[in-house]
Amino acid sequence: MDFKDKKDDGILEKLVHINRITKVVKGGRRFGFSALVVVGNQAGKIGVAHAKAKQVPDAIKKANETARRVLIHVPLREGRTIHHDVYGKDGAGKIILRSAPKGTGIIAGGPVRAVCEVLGIKDIVAKSMGTSNPHNMIRATMKALSKQNSPKHIATIRNKKISDVIEKRG
């Protein structure tokens, strides 16, 4: 059974990282596995989870179930990119996400690409710095995406019209 991309009831599941973990006990070592998973509906909803179990399939299943419970909404511009450039940091992981014109594609590496694909982002440029640890990169990406505001939300806060908030975009 392939666990990489599993699509069920409109939710796309992507396995980002599997790690073998060891617990040292009096009688020796106990081995287990941890799984990092991102899930999303490819229309602005995303969930991230990390789970541990004795077997790989059990860890993936637990992570998928947890990620489905913690879905959050991320506003997208035209359903294909983010509204404005954002920066996120977690631990040593730093990420810069920039909106891109139509046809650019997903220019991002590793874990950040998985987040963009399950979120439904089609055009984005991402630069990750500091670490290649998938856990920190995913958390930094989620922090960056949660900082994003739609022009409608910004207009309401500033008591202005949406057209006054939106600048000429390329």
From Swiss-Prot:
Taxonomic superkingdom: Bacteria
PROSITE patterns: RIBOSOMAL_S5, S5_DSRBD
Record Pfam families: Ribosomal_S5, Ribosomal_S5_C
A GO-annotated cellular component: small ribosomal subunit
Gene Ontology MF term list: rRNA binding; structural constituent of ribosome
Annotated S5 DRBM domain residues: 11-74
Key words of the record: Ribonucleoprotein, Ribosomal protein, RNA-binding, rRNA-binding
InterPro entries: Ribosomal_Su5_D2-typ_SF (IPR020568), Ribosomal_uS5 (IPR000851), Ribosomal_uS5_bac-type (IPR005712), Ribosomal_uS5_C (IPR005324), Ribosomal_uS5_N (IPR013810), Ribosomal_uS5_N_CS (IPR018192), Ribsml_uS5_D2-typ_fold_subgr (IPR014721)
One of the GO BP terms on file: translation
Database matches in SUPFAM superfamilies: dsRNA-binding domain-like (SSF54768), Ribosomal protein S5 domain 2-like (SSF54211)
Domain-level remarks: The N-terminal domain interacts with the head of the 30S subunit; the C-terminal domain interacts with the body and contacts protein S4. The interaction surface between S4 and S5 is involved in control of translational fidelity.
Assembly mode: Part of the 30S ribosomal subunit. Contacts proteins S4 and S8.
Similarity annotation: Belongs to the universal ribosomal protein uS5 family.
Function field: With S4 and S12 plays an important role in translational accuracy. Located at the back of the 30S subunit body where it stabilizes the conformation of the head with respect to the body.
Name of the featured protein: Small ribosomal subunit protein uS5
Species for this entry: Pelagibacter ubique (strain HTCC1062)
Gene label: rpsE
